[in-house]
């Protein structure tokens, strides 16, 4: 158990401002066979990031962009140490646009060598938690990014090492994270890192990792899953039409108090001891009734405001987002050729 002094030492240096923003998906997939078979939206693959995304986020008052990336956008697992420079230049431009528009950029490995949260769908030739080769490749990539962006202040750029770790022990996860952080800090000692909690029935922080200097502890806002991923073909959720509050069984009703218990409380001790906490992903897929989604979002946003946690909606453009979400029950506004969910945007801007 990490002590309070260690946790205080591990908090993000200079306590970053409250970040509010979005996930941008251009590097989320590398080839059509990753997610596109389940949802055509995920067919957006290894494309350049889009400058107007940064401009619009800044115009609306947001200051954060998380880039969830598949390592296969820059490398082939058959030749993993050969890195495609063209892909890195795409990422360079996103980092530069972050500076231009005052938007913090967070690089994330959503698919790392040997691990994806969707392992059942996305087969890997290694296991990141047990295979040294996968761990060496993982550290090689993070060191490469650290060297490439050395000198860019952490106020502008952070590294979120692994998306939603699961199917591993806390000790296995800690070993991989510490190796990744060491590889980053060898090249760039001051780089801020973001560390996801372990995924299971609920998201739990690994308190020992909260003691890593200049780190942020990341959680999620996907609860209850039956509401946030209603009818999502990759999620296997019940077909019960969501309401908010939402009764899951005779004895369980999800409401604001349950959100606090399940999603805030596990991180409250760390936050009270000085750790910075951030919600790296959250949102509702487009089959959840719009009014229900907005009511649920308001409760989560108000809770995060109370504890001063920042957040990044999944996503800006797409089925969870404020642009081009393709909801059947929304009257969209034309925004430069895109369909804008103005009601959802204004709700986000309140907080």
Tell where the protein language model's regions lie, with residue ranges.
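Short, solvent-exposed turn/loop segments enriched in Gly/Ser/Thr/Pro and often Arg
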Residues: 68-71, 109-116, 197-199, 312-321
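N-terminal export signals
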Residues: 1-14
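Mature N-terminal segment immediately following signal peptide/propeptide cleavage
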Residues: 17-26
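Aromatic-rich peripheral "rim/lid" segments of glycoside hydrolase catalytic domains that contact
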Residues: 289-351
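Active-site region of glycoside hydrolase catalytic domains
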Residues: 18, 119, 123, 128-253, ...
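Aromatic-lined substrate-binding rim segments of carbohydrate-active enzymes
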Residues: 49-114, 176-177, 181-188, 293-304
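Short, acidic/polar
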Residues: 42-58, 138, 262-266, 297
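Acidic/histidine-rich helix-loop elements
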Residues: 25-49, 78-83, 123, 127-132, ...
């Amino acid at each position: 158990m990490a002590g309070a002094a260690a946790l205080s030492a591990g908090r993000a240096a200079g306590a970053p401002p409250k970040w509010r923003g979005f996930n941008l998906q251009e590097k989320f997939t590398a080839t059509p066979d990753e997610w596109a078979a389940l949802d055509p939206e995920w067919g957006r693959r290894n494309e350049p990031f889009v400058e107007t995304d940064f401009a619009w986020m800044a115009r609306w008052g947001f200051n954060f962009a998380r880039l969830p990336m598949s390592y296969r956008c820059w490398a082939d697992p058959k030749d993993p140490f050969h890195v495609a420079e063209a892909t890195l230049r795409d990422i360079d431009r996103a980092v530069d646009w972050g500076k231009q528009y005052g938007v913090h950029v967070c690089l994330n490995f959503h698919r790392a060598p040997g691990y994806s949260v969707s392992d059942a769908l996305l087969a890997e030739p290694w296991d990141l938690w047990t295979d040294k080769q996968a761990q060496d490749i993982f550290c090689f990539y993070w060191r490469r990014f650290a060297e490439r962006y050395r000198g860019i202040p952490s106020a502008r750029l952070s590294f979120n090492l692994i998306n939603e770790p699961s199917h591993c022990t806390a000790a296995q996860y800690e070993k991989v994270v510490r190796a990744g952080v060491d590889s980053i800090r060898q090249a760039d000692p001051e780089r801020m890192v973001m560390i996801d909690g372990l995924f299971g029935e609920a998201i739990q922080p690994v308190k020992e990792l909260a003691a890593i200097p200049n780190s942020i502890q990341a959680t999620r806002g996907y609860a209850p899953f039956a509401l946030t991923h209603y009818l999502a073909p990759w999620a296997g959720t019940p077909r019960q039409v969501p309401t908010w509050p939402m009764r899951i069984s005779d004895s369980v009703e999800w409401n604001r108090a349950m959100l606090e218990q399940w999603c805030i409380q596990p991180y409250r001790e760390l936050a009270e001891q000085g750790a910075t906490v951030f919600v790296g992903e959250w949102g509702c897929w487009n089959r959840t009734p719009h009014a229900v989604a907005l009511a649920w979002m308001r409760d989560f946003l108000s809770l995060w405001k109370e504890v001063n946690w920042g957040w990044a909606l999944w996503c800006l453009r797409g089925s969870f987002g404020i642009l081009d979400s393709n909801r059947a029950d929304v009257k969209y506004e034309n925004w430069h050729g895109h369909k804008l969910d103005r009601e959802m945007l204004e709700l986000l801007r309140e907080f």
